[in-house]
Amino acid sequence: MQNRQIIEPKRSIDVIHETDVLVVGSGPGGLSAAIASARCGVKTTLLERFGCFGGNITVVGVEGFAWYRHEKTVEAGGIGREFEELAKEMGAAVPESQSLSYELDSEGFKLVADKLVMDSGIHPMLHRSFSMP
């Protein structure tokens, strides 16, 4: 098969924001990466295409991540556990019926995510998409 190329014309793009770390997508992985980065003192921007943080958990209503804890669970703690504890404090979580965890609905997840993003000093950019120039 012959290699083909797409040639893009030169264009000027205005710079609207500068950052050290850009995290694209705010699902559980993106949120954790952005929070960890910001807590290290790095200028961090979190970009999300929808109007709220959380990815599929909040936009589609996919089941949350805090359902796994049982009596013999070995757990590392970390941001996921911190997220669950903050949700309990904020009244955004209820005991999960099949485990020792707490479950968060998508609306509760949004509230907790917003608080963690703002408290961590992350620069949020909602309703944005990313493309390479």
For the regions a protein language model found, what residue spans apply to each?
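Conserved N-terminal/central alpha/beta ligand/cofactor-binding core
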Residues: 2, 10, 16-18, 36, ...
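N-terminal Rossmann-like FAD-binding beta1-loop-alpha1 element of flavoenzymes
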Residues: 21-45
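Short Cys/His-rich Zn2+-coordinating modules
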Residues: 6
